[in-house]
Each structure stands twice: as structure tokens, then as C-alpha cells.
């Protein structure tokens, strides 16, 4: 019964993500842990806004084997890696939003640091806007096992929290339930949009643009 409720919650989250436009053109993938050895993940090439329960495939987390023989998402290995690394993770959401895609390219370092935003508290455990939330950025790679190795190497030295970005690709985020994963996704997307807007304003504020009219309120019109 719990599994059915969680899958229902994940389907609702997928439809909501589709409405947001965060997984265009069948992009992205979503998964749900069943137990320590298995998860459900979206089948390759499915529109996330119109998914049904039968569009989720059973996968063995130890080796990415799909008993049904159907084709899961190409990035299944990143989902199963997260389930192996962190037993508390119950759901993983991977989206391709414009904000995540652009920010991951604009930020040249290996992490996006979010600080000063009240909405950081949408992320579990965050208590103050003064703290820094670090979202790692990994260079994109079509070889998913290689990309998974880089993520695992990072996690060996510093625990992953909330999510990570793949440069020019999108966001992976998770939670200890579908509800928490969805909240983390919504919170991070809001923070990404704020950060992108802030950077755009910073760039524009450095451009010397002279107004075409005199806007001094103390000057009388002639």
C-alpha cells in the first residue's frame, strides 16, 4: 500500500513537472526506491507530463539490470548510484529546466553556491539565509558510468546534499520521500531563478546606459 501511495505521489510530481516545463521533449527521468535492492525508474523516451504507472520499470540497483528487458532511462546509473550511496534517499528527480541548464554553464567553477536567500530554508536542515548551500557541478558526459564515477569520487570526500547539476544538462535532486524530493526541486528551481536574475542584473548594472530624457524630478519642464 505504501509503495502504491509513493508511486501515486511520484506520478503527480511528474505531471506537475511537465506542467512547469522542466522536462521538455521527453527529457529528464524520475525514480522511486522500492527496497535496498530495487527501484522504479521511468522508461526511456516517455513524456513526463503524461506518465502512467506502467511507464516505470523495475531496476536492480546493484547492477542496473531490468528484469522486463525494456529500456530504462539512459541515466539510470546515476539514480542507482544515489540509492547505493545514501540508503535514506527514497526518490530522485532529474529535470532539464532552462534555469538549471543555463546556470550550470554560466558558473565556471565546480559548484554553485547559494547564499542570502530566505528560500534556502525550503531545503531540509537549512535554518538561515546566512548559510551557504553548495550544489556541485559535474561536466556533462554521454558515458554515464564515467559520470557516475566522478559523482561517486566527489561523494567520497564530501556528502552530497539536496542535488547536483550536470553542466549544460540539468539538475538531479532527491529526498527521503517523494514529497521532500518535490519540495527540494521546487526550492532549488526558485533559488536558481533568483541567482540567474541576480547575475543578469549585476551584468546590466555595469553597463553605462544614458537615458534619452531628463529624469531629474527637480528640474521644471520648459
Swiss-Prot record:
Which coenzyme or cofactor does it need? Answer: Zn(2+)
Q: Where does Zn(2+) bind?
A: 94, 96
GO CC annotation: cytoplasm
What does the record's cofactor remark say about binding?
Answer: Binds 1 zinc ion per subunit.
Instruction: Offer an example of a GO molecular function term for this protein.
Output: zinc ion binding
A Gene Ontology annotation in the biological process aspect, one of them, is: monosaccharide metabolic process
Catalytic activity, as annotated: 5-(methylsulfanyl)-D-ribulose 1-phosphate = 5-methylsulfanyl-2,3-dioxopentyl phosphate + H2O
Domain of life according to the entry: Bacteria
Looking up InterPro entries in the UniProt record yields: Aldolase_II/adducin_N (IPR001303), Aldolase_II/adducin_N_sf (IPR036409), MethylthioRu-1-P_deHdtase_MtnB (IPR017714)
- Give the pathway annotation: Amino-acid biosynthesis; L-methionine biosynthesis via salvage pathway; L-methionine from S-methyl-5-thio-alpha-D-ribose 1-phosphate: step 2/6
What start-end ranges are recorded for coiled-coil regions in this protein?
none
UniProt keyword list = Amino-acid biosynthesis, Lyase, Metal-binding, Methionine biosynthesis, Zinc
Q: What is its EC number?
A: 4.2.1.109
Q: Which HAMAP family match?
A: Salvage_MtnB
Q: Which NCBIfam families match?
A: PRK09220.1 (NF006672), salvage_mtnB (TIGR03328)
Of which family is this protein a member?
A: Belongs to the aldolase class II family. MtnB subfamily.
User: What is the purpose of this protein?
Assistant: Catalyzes the dehydration of methylthioribulose-1-phosphate (MTRu-1-P) into 2,3-diketo-5-methylthiopentyl-1-phosphate (DK-MTP-1-P).
Q: What is this protein called?
A: Methylthioribulose-1-phosphate dehydratase
Q: Which species is listed as the source?
A: Yersinia pseudotuberculosis serotype O:3 (strain YPIII)
Amino acid at each position: 500500500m505504501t509503495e502504491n501511495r509513493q508511486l501515486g505521489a511520484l506520478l503527480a510530481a511528474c505531471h506537475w513537472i511537465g506542467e512547469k516545463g522542466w522536462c521538455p521533449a521527453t527529457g529528464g527521468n524520475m525514480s522511486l526506491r522500492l527496497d535496498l535492492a530495487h527501484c522504479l525508474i521511468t522508461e526511456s523516451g516517455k513524456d513526463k507530463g503524461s506518465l502512467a504507472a506502467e511507464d516505470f520499470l523495475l531496476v536492480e540497483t546493484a547492477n542496473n539490470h531490468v528484469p522486463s528487458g525494456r529500456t530504462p532511462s539512459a541515466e539510470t546509473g546515476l539514480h542507482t548510484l544515489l540509492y547505493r550511496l545514501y540508503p535514506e534517499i527514497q526518490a530522485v528527480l532529474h529535470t532539464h529546466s532552462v534555469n538549471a541548464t543555463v546556470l550550470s554553464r554560466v558558473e565556471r567553477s565546480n559548484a554553485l553556491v547559494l547564499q542570502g536567500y530566505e528560500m534556502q530554508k525550503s531545503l531540509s536542515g537549512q535554518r538561515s539565509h546566512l548559510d551557504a548551500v553548495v550544489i556541485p557541478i559535474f561536466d556533462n558526459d554521454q558515458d554515464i558510468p564515467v559520470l557516475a564515477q566522478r559523482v561517486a569520487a566527489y561523494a567520497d570526500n564530501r556528502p552530497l546534499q539536496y542535488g547536483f547539476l550536470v553542466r549544460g544538462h540539468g539538475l538531479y535532486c532527491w529526498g527521503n520521500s517523494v514529497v521532500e524530493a518535490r519540495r527540494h526541486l521546487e526550492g532549488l528551481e526558485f533559488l536558481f531563478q533568483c541567482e540567474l536574475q541576480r547575475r543578469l542584473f549585476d551584468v546590466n548594472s555595469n553597463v553605462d546606459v544614458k537615458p534619452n530624457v531628463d529624469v531629474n524630478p527637480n528640474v521644471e519642464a520648459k
